[in-house]
Amino acid sequence: MAKQSGIKWLWLSLVVITLDLFSKYLVVERFELYESINILPIFNLTYARNYGAAFSFLADHSGWQKYLFLTLAIIISFILANVLRRNQIDQKRENMAYALIIGGAIGNAIDRAYRGYVVDFFDFYWHIYHYPVFNIADVAIVMGAGLLILETFLDKKKKSD
């Protein structure tokens, strides 16, 4: 019997996309732009718009970056979906990582295509120093990248044993 493909992990991408888009919908519907609600002494929910990439990279350009980031998200998602298709279903950490990255990339791409920008709202700070505002899709991408790094170290350790 043939082994099952890792493509079945795309369910996780759908969960990320759903949570991401729903959270952004709630923020846009209930907050004014730049409105902030303090949740903890180091954390606010703040409605911000990001016209660029991570940390608002290229946000101050004339609009071409929207198409660049959309194209990159689509290409990366297709490449990673192909990797999932080739992986075995039991490669859990690696498949989970790719699915998280795909979900985050598509969540932000949908936002960018629909609105022309990405809605961000998680605002962590210490005194007057604010970390760049981000969203659930960004968290998924970072978690996926972190899992890939972890998998690399664990794989090296396993091979050396």
Swiss-Prot record:
Membrane spanning residue stretches: 9-29, 64-84, 96-113, 133-153
Organism: Haemophilus ducreyi (strain 35000HP / ATCC 700724)
Function: This protein specifically catalyzes the removal of signal peptides from prolipoproteins.
GO biological process, one term: proteolysis
Name this polypeptide is given: Lipoprotein signal peptidase
InterPro entries: Peptidase_A8
Pfam entry (one): Peptidase_A8
Active-site residues from the entry: D120, D138
Pathway annotation: Protein modification; lipoprotein biosynthesis (signal peptide cleavage)
Documented EC number(s): 3.4.23.36
Similarity comment: Belongs to the peptidase A8 family.
Keyword terms of this UniProt record: Aspartyl protease, Cell inner membrane, Cell membrane, Hydrolase, Membrane, Protease, Transmembrane, Transmembrane helix
Gene: lspA
Tagged with keyword Membrane: yes
Membrane topology classification: Multi-pass membrane protein
